[in-house]
Amino acid sequence: MHERRLNILLRPAALLYGLVAAVRNALFDRGMLKAWKSPIPVVSIGNLTAGGTGKTPLVDWVLKYYLSIGCRPAVVSRGYGRRSKGVQLVSDGRNILLGSTRSGDETAMLAANNPEAVVVVAEQRSEGVQFIMERFRGERPDVIILDDAFQHRQLARDLDIVVINSREPFAAAKMLPEGRLREPKSGIGRADVAVLSKITDESKADAIEAELTGSVALVARTRVVIGELSPFGPKGRSTAPHPDPAGLKALAFAGIASPASFVESLMKKGVHVVEQRFFRDHEPYTLNNFLPLVEEARRKGLTLVTTEKDRYRLEGEPGLLEKTEGVGCCCLNIATGFTRGAEKLQEMLKAVVRD
């Protein structure tokens, strides 16, 4: 009943949000608002809904693909959760220059996992691209990947990829703030590629694909590739080898949009999740919210287990990990794998830099 009343209160704001988004899209579609065309090829990876689609692992996959074929890619991201403003150079492709507090947790993770890529954060993606063109004038990247930029239409793109969470593909078709849609569902028609993520029901994925057929050139499907548990701790303290996940007793914690997927992945690895504690997506860790986790884990003999992006957020906060003396900490590494459409997507990505 409370949720229903809240939805009724939020509905006028959602209607206004949807109207503004629709008018804005119409102005771009009719050429009344112009998009700036970068001389460097641009690939955009985004979504229709707010949070929790598996977009960041796909950005990582695309980065690694371009590096594997000898290209020099760059990423421009907003840098959600960062404590900095304007355009910031996170990595120049040789050295990582900023930590997670000034770059954002996801951006810090992308830079660390792809050290040869240029990584920039900017509220306005076009400003980030222009910065790259000036800063790397003599050695410009071959391609720029826009992270979470489907709605950022001021910057033209050569390939538009939208990630769709197949568990809740269009978040019950309700606009923000009543639901999670950032724009009307019809916006999917601007995309070249739709990537279905978090598939648990193939028949539901089939139905989504059938609905999208004709609107996009390719509908691809992904799966979560569950990696190792990687131990971490304060700099200078030796960490234990990779723990055996089978039977590991854990206090699982994270500040992400879809914590249920994280817990499911831990359980698939054989981790015994004894306790769970979750925070808002990108919420900063402080002594006030992290120390209770450490104390509970120490008291109950549990290992602290979190996500890779939460690890980078923790490592960016001076002094926090020093409080974990006597308590094991590790993060679960995940990646994107494809069950359908990988080769076709690679062809499309290659065509962007070839043309």
UniProtKB/Swiss-Prot annotation:
InterPro entries: LpxK (IPR003758), P-loop_NTPase (IPR027417). It catalyses: a lipid A disaccharide + ATP = a lipid IVA + ADP + H(+). Pfam families: LpxK. Keywords: ATP-binding, Kinase, Lipid A biosynthesis, Lipid biosynthesis, Lipid metabolism, Nucleotide-binding, Transferase. Pathway: Glycolipid biosynthesis; lipid IV(A) biosynthesis; lipid IV(A) from (3R)-3-hydroxytetradecanoyl-[acyl-carrier-protein] and UDP-N-acetyl-alpha-D-glucosamine: step 6/6. ATP binds at T49, A50, G51, G52, T53, G54, K55, T56. The keyword Transferase applies. PANTHER family: TETRAACYLDISACCHARIDE 4'-KINASE (PTHR42724), TETRAACYLDISACCHARIDE 4'-KINASE, MITOCHONDRIAL-RELATED (PTHR42724:SF1). This is Tetraacyldisaccharide 4'-kinase. The gene is lpxK.
